[in-house]
Amino acid sequence: MIYLHAIDPIAFSLGPVQVHWYGLMYLAAFFSAWALGRSRILRGRLPGVDMDGFSDLLFYGMLGVVLGGRIGYMLFYAFDTFLANPLILFKVWEGGMSFHGGLLGVLIACGLWTRRHRLHFFDVMDFVAPLVPLGLGFGRLGNFVGGELWGKFTQAGWGVIFPHAPELADWPPAQLQAQYAAGALDRFARHPSQLYEAALEGVVMFVVLWTFSMKPRARYAVSGLFALLYGVFRFIVEFVRVPDAPLGYLAFNWLTMGQILSLPLIGVGLVLLALSRRAPVLQPVVPAAAGVEAAK
């Protein structure tokens, strides 16, 4: 049944402060990463790192996600707007985050953390990779709740009518409800591409990566699988997702910026998987403190 999107993006208010679902999704993403990471730290899956060190790593990662995601969006998707008004970079409440920018931010932040702790960069990345997909899924759910990043038109029974889409943005809510009840809005239904990405980048990637990494794998393997899966899934979903308005299609009347940025990920993923065939396997070393905590 075609659904009319009518979700309030504001979860609740605390006096004058409005708490948005999108912000709560970020909290859920970071909490899931902490909970999953904690379980593996206690099992010694990142030798030499205790919970204090992991909390520090998570903080670095959070900064990388937020700063990299925002800067990446401005550079990849809204560069002209940024040049006209550089201060818009700090207006995060107006929306605009890029996964690829966030990924670069995380790589830089974790690289700094790794150098400080004198660990191999890809041992850390292999540890971090399985902690990420659930956060990606929560982020895409936030996009859906906010009614943004919608897909192309579809007549599939699971299509969603987004009132903020250009063709309906000027319609009064009462008129939308009346026309929807009469079945007159079905032609405006769109692919819920946010939910497709939540399922693929969130659920499927998490199940595959978490299961694959349950036993120690060769260095590069988990990171390579993450890059490959994300690149492929994002490239596929872009075919039913409306390209970002300022850019549109960049080539062949179908190639989007999201696909262009995903192609290098696919290549990097394949290279890392190839390198893993001759790489060492990092064996768990359970910290003494972790053993005591686990025993409790």
Curated annotation (Swiss-Prot):
Main location: membrane
Subcellular location: Cell inner membrane
Keyword annotations of the record: Cell inner membrane, Cell membrane, Membrane, Transferase, Transmembrane, Transmembrane helix
Any one GO BP annotation for this protein: lipoprotein biosynthetic process
Top-level EC class: transferase
GO cellular component: plasma membrane
Pathway(s) of this molecule: Protein modification; lipoprotein biosynthesis (diacylglyceryl transfer)
Protein name: Phosphatidylglycerol--prolipoprotein diacylglyceryl transferase
Source organism (scientific name): Xanthomonas campestris pv. campestris (strain ATCC 33913 / DSM 3586 / NCPPB 528 / LMG 568 / P 25)
Organismal lineage: Bacteria, Pseudomonadati, Pseudomonadota, Gammaproteobacteria, Lysobacterales
